[in-house]
Amino acid sequence: MTPHPIQDAVLRVDRLSVVYPGGVTALRDTSIAFRRGEFTVLLGLSGAGKSTLLRSLNRLVTPTGGSVTSELGELGSGSALRQHRRRTAMIFQHHQLIERQSALANVLTGRLAFHNTLRSLFPLPRADQEIALSCLARVGLADKALSRVDKLSGGQQQRVGIARALAQQPAIILADEPVASLDPATSVRVLGLLRDICKEDGITAIVSLHQLEYARRFADRVVGLADSQIVFDAAPSELTDAQLERIYAGRSTTQPANAPAEPPVMLEPSLEMSR
């Protein structure tokens, strides 16, 4: 599909392809642009390519071909990528929290990218702590600031993950299946909270989901993926039965039957610290 004009975009993907070891094609010749302040849902079955596309936007996955360009320039391995990662926050399905630490300590890790390695070994300044407390308040967890994360419910843990992302003061949030492990009521609350905050702050959000009902309820734009490529890109109101059949019935005929859907990603230590 032809991407939207870069003048209207904070991120642009041009002819991106990702092939994992073993010949597994996770993404093929994909082009798309993401507009400022838009809440976009990447919709599709497991293995459709949505997580690979999402992670490619922050170079958690290294493309086999093509390019990703932000307002800072093409994202390779230099300063443009470092600056892009600083302004791009991640929210993960399994929280990626330090369970024995408090909610506040976890949210403060969102501030580490603003300090050099030596400074991050010591308690962060009061200003950072105030930012972290404010972020916890925004997700309704001010009273849980000093509670250990492993004592919180799954929904509360995911809200800590959102607060950590907000502490990074991002221009972009990438959320990879953020409600896959939550019950329906909690999922609606978490997605509604995330969408409202992104709208209030003008944050561009790109969220991968497999649940159609959530895409219809929360998305400004739905990008449907099947067989490692984009097959739909429009407002959720434009989804037809035929298009849904294509998104949800798409099966790869080129990948081995026992190939992993989208292999796990090992994060670089520097990126792990910056989250």
Curated annotation (Swiss-Prot):
How this chain sits in the membrane, per its record, is:
Peripheral membrane protein
Q: Which GO terms describe its cellular component?
A: plasma membrane
Q: Name one GO molecular function term.
A: ATP hydrolysis activity
**CDD domains referenced in this protein's UniProt entry, alphabetically:** ABC_PhnC_transporter
Q: Which domain of life is it from?
A: Bacteria
InterPro entries in the record: AAA+_ATPase, ABC_transporter-like_ATP-bd, ABC_transporter-like_CS, ABC_transpr_PhnC, MetN_ABC_transporter-like, P-loop_NTPase
Chain intervals for the UniProt region annotation (Disordered) = 251-275
UniProt key word Translocase: yes
Q: Where is the ABC transporter domain?
A: 11-252
Reactions accelerated catalytically: phosphite(out) + ATP + H2O = phosphite(in) + ADP + phosphate + H(+)
Query: Which of UniProt's keywords are assigned here?
Result: ATP-binding, Cell inner membrane, Cell membrane, Membrane, Nucleotide-binding, Translocase, Transport
Primary localization class, coarse: membrane
Q: What is its EC number?
A: 7.6.2.-
Tell me which family the UniProt entry assigns to this protein. Belongs to the ABC transporter superfamily. Phosphonates importer (TC 3.A.1.9.1) family.
Q: What does this protein do?
A: Part of the ABC transporter complex PtxABC involved in phosphite import. Responsible for energy coupling to the transport system.
Annotated NCBIfam families:
ABC_phnC
Instruction: Kindly state the subunit structure of this protein.
Output: The complex is composed of two ATP-binding proteins (PtxA), two transmembrane proteins (PtxC) and a solute-binding protein (PtxB).
Write the protein's name.
Phosphite import ATP-binding protein PxtA
Q: Which gene encodes it?
A: ptxA
